[in-house]
Amino acid sequence: MPLSSHSERLMGTTITISLVDERADSLLQKSFDLLKELEYRFNANSQESELMEINYQAGIAPVKVHPDLFELISLGLEHSLAPSSHLNISIGPLIQTWRIGFSDAKVAQLQEIESVLPLINPHYIKLDSSTSTVFLKQKGMKIDLGCLAKGYSADKVAQFLREEGVTSALINLGGNILTIGKNQARGNQPWQIGIQDPANPRGNHLMTIPVVNKSVVTSGIYERHLTVDGKDYHHIFDSQTGYPVETELASLTIISDKSVDGEIWTTRLFGERPASILWQVESLEGIEAILIDKEGHLSCSSGIPTL
């Protein structure tokens, strides 16, 4: 049976779902309907999203939210509060100050950065599981789930497809890959996933890995950036300084069972020294990593050759 695919522009990127199934057209339509529902829930750049209602009510009142949104904020908050974590879901005011990745991107002024840094504090996010409410204690705070939403959404689509009996699929959310089973359209071989060469245009790979029932998530400074007066500013920010994080890395890829875990650990670890990243990954069950530094050197965690 051939591979059936459908692509749409959602969540600020091109999303493609490919699967092998007699009901492909119907399943693809339902998968994208689910993604549109999740985008409405999690979008930090839409005035109409459920997430934005929380941000509008910052410093005013708690907001009751859908269980999916509560779950994702809870997960994001847990990892934002973890020691030495570079993940911070309260980073919204800083993202909106720089706007890197948007048409109105600019280099933020020091005064602007200093004015929003006090708002980037995940300790000011208060959750009440008994009422499913979220409250931002300081006016001007903004939650941004951009570092987690694609992974969480990919997992939701995979869960739906598995419940429908799909045994061969590839979900590609703008380079965040999640696979179900093997590629039945190509002799039931593992899916072959390329690891992007950060120094070259998309589609140029430094290596290819075989993947079965795994997620492959890459975060890199090459993805979205702004160049002003010869200086390059990427989109991965340091919550402490308000500026793009200083790093030796060009990209960090995490291979995991769940896509949201790939999002969590690429974000938590980006900004650490490569040796520290590999040391931490070795202690995480079910997590592997591929690091590419700015010189193009590649290093991998111990489980990569056995994938």
Named regions from a protein language model:
Residues 1-307:
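Mature catalytic core of soluble alpha/beta enzymes
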